Amino acid sequence: MARVKFGKVTRARRKRWIKRAKGYYGTKHSSYKKAHEQVVRSMAYAFIGRKQKKRDFRKLWIVRINAAVRPYGLSYSKFMNGLKLANIDVNRKMLSELAISNPEQFKLLVDASNKALTSK
């Protein structure tokens, strides 16, 4: 009787790794060993990327807010300090969206920030 090198359980497990490597270049999408190595590496990059995405978006919002308050003679840090003094608790994402889509409402926040800074 011939020796069974791997059965259906092993085949299914290997097939799962190959399926995850769909679309990869070269032997990385067909060879089990290469596919497994690449998928593990890809998952590590994806994990890191999910953390970086949060940083990148925060940076983007800060740049947008800074660009929006400069015409009013304020810097980003002074503007945020003024909002804090005025007890206005709006997150950076919303401030960025307001600056782009609704400049007149954003101007009201800038005025409130200025007022809080001058009355300090």
From Swiss-Prot:
GO terms for molecular function: rRNA binding; structural constituent of ribosome. Gene3D superfamilies: 6.10.160.10, Ribosomal protein L20 (1.10.1900.20). InterPro entries: Ribosomal_bL20, RIBOSOMAL_L20_CS, Ribosomal_protein_bL20_C. CDD domains: Ribosomal_L20. GO terms for cellular component: ribonucleoprotein complex; ribosome. Keywords: Ribonucleoprotein, Ribosomal protein, RNA-binding, rRNA-binding. It comes from the Bacteria. PANTHER family: 39S RIBOSOMAL PROTEIN L20. This is Large ribosomal subunit protein bL20. It comes from Mesoplasma florum (strain ATCC 33453 / NBRC 100688 / NCTC 11704 / L1). The gene is rplT.
